[in-house]
Amino acid sequence: MTGQPLLGDLLTLASDALPEVEALFETARSALKERVTTDGKVSSKALEEEQFAAHALSWLATYVESLRQMRAWAGRLETEGRFGEMEALILQIAFGEYLAQIRGGIPMSQTETARVQDIGIELGHPGEAVRRLIQAGNTPAARARLVALMRDNHGRATFGASGLDEELEMIRDQFRRFADERVAPHAHGWHMRDELIPMEIVEALAEMGVFGLTIPEEFGGFGLSKASMVVVSEELSRGYIGVGSLGTRSEIAAELILCGGTDAQKAAWLPKLASGEILPTAVFTEPNTGSDLGSLRTRAVKDGDEWVVHGNKTWITHAARTHVMTLLARTDLETTDYRGLSMFLAEKVPGTDADPFPTPGMTGGEIEVLGYRGMKEYEIGFDGFRVKAENLLGGVEGQGFKQLMQTFESARIQTAARAIGVAQNALEVGMQYAEERKQFGKALIEFPRVAGKLAMMAVEIMVARQLTYHSAWEKDHGQRCDLEAGMAKLLGARVAWAAADNALQIHGGNGFALEYQISRILCDARILNIFEGAAEIQAQVIARRLLD
């Protein structure tokens, strides 16, 4: 291992490299847009035929935005006098690696690599800043020095300053302690026994304000920022993704009601959601529809002052012991697309293990799953299930899909935050094992490839963090952020899976044993590329947004 680990003019190099990759992205976007445009509009058929190129563009855009946010993060820290050696190494390795991948190939999955040639453009010679960062950014010396600093900073919530303000870091500390004391010691047992998260944990979260975190104070919540929601989700998911996901249900339900509910619905439902008095579940997906929500077939027919629901739903998280369903159903039976869908706040009686669905008109059964346990997944059948007419969201039919889309930004930001928490957990577990496990007379962490895995985990977690924090900042400031939130979710899910897989690899054969918690973390990480929009769907949505 030779050479100095840290480049002397790093911030200047990073600034100088950005215009080159931004120009590359614009060239790629123009080239693809020309191929998929018919009569002045982007053709859905042509875009599908060019799907690989379109998704390559999405990943290229995600990398460019990630580097942009990393440079902005470094600049803020530099101004505040907090840009130290660890932060500099993280920035340098991130730029070195991501620039190399932009020019050589970005992994979309284990067997799919996105290259700019797929989009139909040729690469020229790199500029001096890009060349230097690729050549000397992500080096063995840089990775080794970063891991040495990480070992000197055991117990820190993040490796490298997060860039968040003191108030948000205080929130992080509070929930980190809770996760360490009340969640992490029991998470593996809950997973292995496939148990629901105990109600005392749910009640403790309610007392801490998790379910009303972003609900306005006038409705009984704390009125905090989406950034605070991100930090809370990160830390709880670091303890156990199931616990970190409990707040997601309330976040989605509250956002639906805030954006689309009547004044009476807001007054009736939001205080109870904020306090945790009622627990909600999202009931959208149907068998054979997956992400194609516009083709839902569950129907609701008006009968006096009630709606009568018939149909089937699947992959419903935390369905049994909740009190209300945000239920998407077709009220205009003449339609076959999203225009005939309506959203309901459908009340139900919480179930038990012995009788999960006691409400008349409802039946259901558990779907056994690989990971992401703790709330359980269910199939539900509706046969004459009744909903009060006053519980039609907004009091207007046909607005369900539009109302749901208004929640997508927050949902994707929250999912990205959960991914960061899972990745951070994998890093901490992998690093602890690498320091404690001895082979050939020394700790595993002393071997360069093991240390290198840990270094790249820390770097990519910070990249995902900055992209997610930026999305939350945009949301908090009233800016449209569906594109950035989608990118954060797309990248965060890949980072979590890579971190879990590499941490398990560090464990060797022990990682394959169920008794080691990394086996659970791997299973939990796998869902992040699937739910809330599979990676392929997410890339398609991003591409469409970039090209429109």
Curated annotation (Swiss-Prot):
EC number(s) from the headed UniProt entry: 1.3.8.12
pH dependence: Optimum pH is 9.2.
Cofactor names: FAD
Positions that bind FAD: 282-291, 315-317, 437, 505-509, 534-536
InterPro entries: Acyl-CoA_DH_CS, Acyl-CoA_Oxase/DH_mid-dom, Acyl-CoA_Oxase/DH_mid-dom_sf, AcylCo_DH-like_C, AcylCo_DH/oxidase_C, AcylCoA_DH/ox_N, AcylCoA_DH/ox_N_sf, AcylCoA_DH/oxidase_NM_dom_sf
Keyword Oxidoreductase found: yes
Disulfide-bond pairs as recorded: none
MF annotations from Gene Ontology: acyl-CoA dehydrogenase activity; FAD binding; flavin adenine dinucleotide binding; oxidoreductase activity, acting on the CH-CH group of donors, with a flavin as acceptor
Binding site for substrate: 291, 409-412
Known catalytic reactions: (2S)-methylsuccinyl-CoA + oxidized [electron-transfer flavoprotein] + H(+) = 2-methylfumaryl-CoA + reduced [electron-transfer flavoprotein]
Keyword field: FAD, Flavoprotein, Oxidoreductase
Chloroplast found in the keyword field: no
Superkingdom of the organism of origin: Bacteria
Catalytic residues (UniProt): 532 (proton acceptor)
Null allele phenotype: Cells lacking this gene are unable to utilize acetate or acetoacetate as sole carbon source, but grow on succinate or propionate plus bicarbonate.
EC class name: oxidoreductase
Cofactor annotation remark: Binds 1 FAD per subunit.
Chain coiled-coil ranges: none
Known partners and oligomeric status: Homodimer.
Family stated for the protein in its record: Belongs to the acyl-CoA dehydrogenase family.
Function: Involved in the ethylmalonyl-CoA pathway, a new acetyl-CoA assimilation strategy that operates in a number of bacteria and replaces the glyoxylate cycle. Catalyzes the oxidation of (2S)-methylsuccinyl-CoA to yield mesaconyl-(C1)-CoA. Highly specific for (S)-methylsuccinyl-CoA.
Name of this protein: (2S)-methylsuccinyl-CoA dehydrogenase
Organism from which the protein derives: Cereibacter sphaeroides (Rhodobacter sphaeroides)
